[in-house]
Regions:
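Pre-recognition alpha-helix immediately N-terminal to the DNA-recognition helix
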Residues: 22, 49-53, 113, 139
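N-terminal helix-turn-helix DNA-binding core of bacterial DNA-binding proteins
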Residues: 32-74
Length: 149
C-alpha cells in the first residue's frame, strides 16, 4: 500500500506535502505498534520513554524538566506520567537538594527489571521496521535527521 491508498487521497499539493503527510501517518502507525508492545507490561509508550531515559542516566537522578527535554513527545505532561510510574513503584521521587522547587526522579529496581523484560522482546519492536533492510533503515534515519536540520 501507499499513503494515497491508506488515507484515500489521490492528490497532494506537491511531493513535499505528500512526504509530510506520510511522515505524520507513519508516526501514528508506529506509535500504535509501540503501544501494543509496551501495553503487555501495563505501561504506556510515554511511560516506556521515561523509563528508558531514566535507565540511560541511572543511577544519577533527573529532574522532570530534564526528562521532558529528552522525551520523544515533548507535549506530554511529564509530571503526571512520572506520578503514574511512581504509583507503580517503577520510579522514585526526591526533592532536589540544590533547588527545593525541583524533584529528582530515578528508576527503581522494579523499573529496571521491567525494561529488562521488554528488552527481551526487542525483536517484536524491531519488527515495526521489518520491511526495511539495515541499509534502508540507516538511510531513512539519515533523511529524518536531515529534515530536522
Amino acid at each position: 500500500m501507499g499513503i494515497s491508498k491508506d488515507i484515500h487521497q489521490a492528490k497532494f499539493r506537491n511531493e513535499r506535502h505528500k512526504a509530510l503527510i506520510n511522515i505524520l501517518f507513519t508516526y501514528g502507525w508506529t506509535v500504535e505498534r509501540l503501544k501494543e508492545y509496551v501495553s503487555e507490561e501495563g505501561i504506556t509508550h510515554q511511560q516506556f520513554n521515561i523509563l528508558r531515559i531514566l535507565r540511560g542516566n541511572h543511577p544519577t537522578p533527573l529532574s522532570t524538566l530534564s526528562i521532558r527535554e529528552r522525551m520523544i513527545d515533548k507535549m506530554s505532561d511529564t509530571s503526571r506520567i512520572v506520578d503514574r510510574l511512581l504509583s507503580k513503584a517503577l520510579v522514585k521521587k526526591v526533592v532536589c537538594k540544590k533547588d527545593r522547587r525541583l524533584v529528582d526522579v530515578t528508576i527503581t529496581e522494579k523499573g529496571l527489571k521491567l525494561l529488562d523484560k521488554l528488552d527481551g522482546k526487542q525483536d517484536k519492536m524491531d519488527d515495526i521496521l521489518s520491511n526495511l533492510s539495515e541499509k534502508e533503515a540507516s538511510g531513512l534515519s539519515k533523511l529524518l535527521d536531515k529534515i530536522r536540520g
